[in-house]
Amino acid sequence: MSVYKPGIAPIKAQFLRTAWPARSEALDGSTETGADSEPTAFVPDDEPDGKPEQENPTDAAAPTTSSGANRAQDGEQDKPRKRARGQNKGRTFTRTEDNIALCTQIATGRDACKFGDSCKFTHDLCTYLEQKPRDIETPPHPVSSHECVRFVPADERDVYLATLYEHAVMQDTKRIKKNTDVTADAHPASGSTTPSAPTAPTTHDTVQASVVLGTTCPYFQERGTCPMGWKCRFLGAHVRRLSASCRVLGAEAQGMLGTGLELVEDEAKKHAWLHRSPYMRNEAQPESDQVNWLASDVARRLRSRKYTFDKAPAITSALRKEVDMLSAMTPAEAASTEVGKGPLRVNYEHERLVADPSATLEACEDALRNGGNDDAAADTARVRPCEKRRLQWKGDLYLAPLTTTGNLPFRRLCASFGSDIHCGEMGMAESFLQGHASEWSLVRRWEGERIFGTQVCGAKPELLVPTAEVLAREVGRGLDFVDVNCGCPIDLVYNKGAGSALLDHANKLGRIVRGMSEALGEIPLTIKLRTGTTSKPTTHKIFARAQTEWGVGGLSLHGRSRKQRYKNDADWAYIRTCVDTLHDAVRTWNEEPQHADEPDMVPVPVYGNGDVYGWRDYYDHLEHAHVDGTMIARGALIKPWIFTEIKERRDWDISSRERLDMIRQYASYGLTHWGSDTQGVNTTRRFLCEMLSFTHRYVPLGLLDHIPVRMNDRPPPFHGRDPLESLLSSPSAHDWVRISDMFLGPAPPDWHFTPKHRSNAYEQQG
C-alpha cells in the first residue's frame, strides 16, 4: 500500500503510468493511430481545477492547440510536456447547421408551405436528403423511457450493456479507420457494420443513401413521433421506404415529394406518452415534457419595454421611502426602529394613483385612508407571511445551481440517480427583463423534477423586484422557490455590485430580499451565500437578520470566501456557527414581548455546501454542522451517481460500461431537449464534452489503495481496468469528442471544442 500524499489520489502501483499516453488506446485493445494528443507528465497544481462554470460566465474563445506532427519531426514526440495552466477565457463555439436550410413546414411532414415561393427556405426535399449526412446509428434501449439502466432487470441490463459496448467499439473502430484512410469520403453512403447494426438501403439511390433504417431516435422511441421530422439525424427510425426516389424512378416515385419515403408514427407510444403522470404537467402543451415556457407575446413586450408591472413600482417606491426614513435617523434610532424590518407593507392603490398624473387628490387620500385593503386586482392582493409556502426541506438532496453544466439534461440525469431539489442555472436580472430567450430558457423545468427553483443575480432592488414579479406571474406555477445569488465570485458580476458583492452590503441585500419576497407572492425566496468576500468571515451577521428581519424562506452557505475560490477546504465549522446564529436569532425573536401575539417562528432550512464527495462526507456534515441538508456541486459534476451512494450509504465501484450508459443517457436527454437535428446534435455534443471535462476526474474505487478519497486529491497518470475505463479517465478533450462520436456520430470537420482548462485542449482536424 502506497503512502498517502496530500493532494494526490492514492492509486495502486499496478495502475500507475509515468505520463498520459501520446496515443489513446482503442476500445478493441489496439493502439489508436489517428489521435493528435501528446504525452503529458503529472504536474500537481497549487489550486485544483474543479471549478464550476460560475468562474467563467461567458463561453467564448478559439482553440489554440497545435498538431503534434511538427513536434514529431523534431524528435519531441515522446517527451513528456508540462501541462498548460490556467483557463481558456472568453470561449466561442461554432453553430453547426445543415448545408441546405429546409423549410420547417416541409420538415415536419407537410406537402406544401403556406408561404409558397416567397419562403426563404428550400422545399426541395430530395436535394436536402442528398446533402444530408448519414444517419447516426444507435442501439435500442431496453425500455422506452431512456432512464438509468440500473432500473432494468439484471439479465436485460447485462445484455444491453454488452450490446452498448459492442456498438461503442464498432463506432470507435470506424472513426480510427476514417482518420487513417486519407482516401475515405467525408460522408460514405455505407460503412462497416456488425451483423446487428442498422443498415442503409442497399441501393445507389442518392436521396435514400443517408438513411439508416433501424437506428434509434430518442424522440420516437419515447413518444412515438419526432418533431424534427426529415431534419432528424436518426431519420431511419421513423420513415418507411415505399419505393426508389425520383432520382431513379422519376415521376413514378412514391412517398413525400418524390423521396420514396414517408414519415411514420407509433400510435401506441403516442397514446402512452400523452397519458403519462409526471410531477408537473404542461397543460397547454401535453406533448412536451417541459414546463415554464415564456409566451412569445410576453417576450416581445419585455424586449420592447411595454410590459406592465403591477407590483414592482410600488414596492421599489416603498423601499426608497424606507431608505429616506432611515437616513434621517441617528444610528441609535435606526438600530431600534422597526423600519426596514419584517414584511414589506405596500399600498398598491395609493402608489398607483400617485404615479398617475390624472388622479385626483381626493382619490389619493381615499386610497391612503383605506390602507390599500380595497384591492381591485387580484394579482396585487398582498400575501401575508403565514400564507407563503413553507419549504419543508429536511435531508433532501440538493443539486447546486451550476452555470453551463447545470443544464436541464444534466439535472434530469442527476434526478435518475436520486437528487431531490434542483435549482436552474444563474440568470441575470437585466436579461430576464429584456426578454432574452437564452435567459428565459434557464427557468425551463423537466416535468419529473420534484422540487425546482430558479436562481437570479442582480445588484439592486430596481432590477430584482421586477424580475421577481414577472417570474411569479408568467412561470410561477412551475417554480417551487426563487433563489438570489449572493455568492458568485467572478469579477464581471462582483464589480457590478452583484453576486458575492452583496455580502458586504447587508442593508441593500435586506431590501432586495423583502422586495422580492413581496413581489413573489406565495413563492418562497432563498439566498445562496459564501462565508465572505475576504479571508475574514462575515456572513454570520447576515444569518442573524435573514429570517427574523427579512423573512427569507431558506439559506444555503458555501464554506469558502470569494477570495478563497477552491484553494482551501470548505469551512464547515463556520457553517455550523452560522446555523447556530440563525437558530439563536429565531429563539430571541420568539421570546420578545412585542411578538407575543404572533405565531412562533420556526427556523427555515439551512443547507451547507463544499467538498461533499461521498456519503460519509454528507452524513458527517449533517450530524456535526447542524444543517438541514447539503448542497452538492462539484461532487455531482465528477460523479453524478453520488446521490445514489448517499441514499444507499454505500461506495459504488461503478463499472466502465455503466458509466458509458450514463453518457448515453445524457446524450438522449440532450437530444430531446436541444433537438435531434444537426444543430441540436452538436449542441448536445458541446455540453456532453463540458460534462466529460468533470466526469473524467473520477478515479474508480477499484484503483485506489484506500477510501474515502478527498475531492481535491488529483490523480497521477493511470490506466483503468479495461480500455474503456482508461478512455473515460482521459484528460484530453480529443478523447471527450471521441466519446461523443459513439452516440452523436462523427463531429463535423468545422466543429471544435475549447475546454475551460488549457491543459485539456482539443481542435478538430478537418
Curated annotation (Swiss-Prot):
Localization per record: Cytoplasm; Nucleus
Residues that bind FMN: 401-403, 455, 528, 558, 609-611, 633-634
GO cellular component: cytoplasm; nucleus
Active-site positions on this chain: 488 (proton donor)
Family designation: Belongs to the Dus family. Dus3 subfamily.
Keywords linked to the UniProt accession: Cytoplasm, Flavoprotein, FMN, Metal-binding, mRNA processing, NAD, NADP, Nucleus, Oxidoreductase, Repeat, tRNA processing, Zinc, Zinc-finger
Top-level EC class: oxidoreductase
Single biological process term from Gene Ontology: mRNA processing
Start and end residues of each stretch annotated as Disordered: 17-93, 183-203
Feature: compositional bias, Low complexity: 188-203
GO MF annotations in UniProt: flavin adenine dinucleotide binding; mRNA dihydrouridine synthase activity; RNA binding; tRNA-dihydrouridine47 synthase activity; zinc ion binding
Species assigned in the record: Malassezia globosa (strain ATCC MYA-4612 / CBS 7966) (Dandruff-associated fungus)
Zinc fingers, C3H1-type class: 97-126, 216-241
Name assigned to this protein: tRNA-dihydrouridine(47) synthase [NAD(P)(+)]
Catalysed reaction, written as an equation: 5,6-dihydrouridine(47) in tRNA + NAD(+) = uridine(47) in tRNA + NADH + H(+); 5,6-dihydrouridine(47) in tRNA + NADP(+) = uridine(47) in tRNA + NADPH + H(+); a 5,6-dihydrouridine in mRNA + NAD(+) = a uridine in mRNA + NADH + H(+); a 5,6-dihydrouridine in mRNA + NADP(+) = a uridine in mRNA + NADPH + H(+)
Cofactor requirement: FMN
Known function: Catalyzes the synthesis of dihydrouridine, a modified base found in the D-loop of most tRNAs. Specifically modifies U47 in cytoplasmic tRNAs. Catalyzes the synthesis of dihydrouridine in some mRNAs, thereby affecting their translation.
EC number(s) stated in the UniProt entry for this protein: 1.3.1.89, 1.3.1.-
